[in-house]
Amino acid sequence: MKIDLSTAVGLVAGIIIISIGIVGNSGELYWFINGISLLVVLGGTLSATLVNYSIKSLLGLYPVLKNVFTHESYEYQSVIEEIVKKAKIARKSGVVSLEKELNTIDDNFLRNGIELAINERDSKRLRTFLALEIDNIERRHASGQEIFFYMGAYAPAFGMLGTIMGLIIMMENFGGAQIGMQIDAINFNIAEKFAGLLQGMGLALITTFYGVLFSNLVFLPIGGKLKRKSQEEIMVRNIIVEGIMSIHAKEHPILIHEKLMTFVQESKRPNKD
């Protein structure tokens, strides 16, 4: 398992590009740093997620996040070759002969599937077991993806909420104190008040900035990456299922190879001489 540099590079590149956009428009980076705004967005997003999910589900995000920053290569060709190799043995000596080959199989799903094929004579029951395993894998993957997609939806909402809060506070401070229906005489420098108003508006909008930033640079992209990786893994699992069913049916290894290669994109298939 290798480190997936694209995730880290994408995050860093996004921050750099946004920073260039700020500085390039005669802005200062420190204008966009506000702890309270950050607390409202991240704290609010986490709180809403806790309402939607259990603490156990959120604590289970660590291995999911680890998967985002690691790259597990799914080599379709090597999986197909492994299946064809086992198919040759099964066709020559029977499916039961694969029992002594189980320790040589690295992929847990393939190893468990072949073990099921050895012990289960009914092909329909075998396919049902394997399909159930794939469904459970998809369900586990979807749970992690869903959390990040929801967080991507919550973050802008709390960003807007923080902005509204800031505007309300700013207007109250600008308008002065009001008791009942009596309004005290206003005695202030209008220029200073207007400058304070603009400054307060800028601070209020920072919360929206944080909400949009975390949603579109962190939460939604992570959810999308998890979904893409899940699709790749499920593709390999489907190849394995079809291979195991073909071995169980004692199909010819050449036919098995040709059938399984239909799962692979034509551009990734080896050239035939």
Predicted regions and their residues:
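Large intracellular
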Residues: 2-10, 16-147, 232-273
